Amino acid sequence: MRLRLCIYIYSLAVFYVKAPQLENYRAKHEHKPDTIRKEWYEMDKNILLTIEYDGSVFHGWQRQPDRETIQGHLETVLSSLLHTEILLNGTSRTDAGVHAYGQRASFTADVKIPVEKLALVINNILRSREKGSFAASPVRIVKAEEKPADFHARFDSKGKKYIYRIHNAEKSSVFLRNYVYHVPEKLDTDAMRRAAEYLRGTHDFKSFEASGSTPRQTTVRTIYDAEIIVNEESACSFKSMESEDSFKSSGAEPGGDRTSHRADRNIEIHVSGDGFLYNMVRIITGTLVDIGAGKLAPEEMKRIIEARDRTKAGHTAPPYGLYLAEVYY
């Protein structure tokens, strides 16, 4: 009897303290009863992070036991910072070696730190975990923002943009080995552009899904844009630092191209769409490279799409040239 009386008195106290605030909240969100229930009783903030990372030092995004992944790395830092277990909902499960400019991930927690300061605090902790006074973290939070309680980073996304980088040069650079796909054959970028036109629109992209992928309800996707960009003067083209004297002895002209007989080119393939199959961008890239190298005609792209057969498409480009550039909402 005493226990029931105590519970009753406590309930009345909570009601009289919270009721005015709840009524104000209800007036603004009458059309979202689920939101009221979740936000009011959990009292958590829903935080969306924009993340960039160097994928060459991780075993992909998704957490794995006994392996260092981006998701696991960040969850450890956030759980320690917020004194509670944090589970991130990422938009893209990038593979080992794949990088990101704009990965998005959300989580809910009772965050006391001002949201506008959260990215700075997390980045300071990430940096402190690295060895050496000048060591930089391979992961950085670009932005942190609060979203409505019913927001989900993955399920609410409207599309993504990927960039694939190719170093088209006779000789490769050791400094680029983890960040671009080196292709020594000169690529016909005009042919690649003609082929890319067939990708735009809504198609069944079964031919561009990795063999053995988990069966899914549909392999139909919409590609908003597919663009080939060429940069002849990229900062990624490393030149020799040898002296002019040693260069003259080789018979080359000072100031000339010291690495190859033709100008290095950095080619970027930009692909945006409402969703992507497993390895889809890498297989599209491999097919475009085969077309640029003259192994396939540009018109073959249309037949490859229609075939819905992985064996008809080109090779799978390596992961280290791929970047998750942006997630659309």
Please tell me what each predicted stretch does:
Residues 3-5, 12, 22:
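Leucine-biased recognition of intrinsically disordered, low-complexity hydrophobic segments
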Residues 7-9, 17, 30-32:
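Short hydrophobic alpha-helical segments enriched in small aliphatic residues
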Residues 34-329:
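Structured-RNA-binding interfaces characteristic of tRNA pseudouridine synthases
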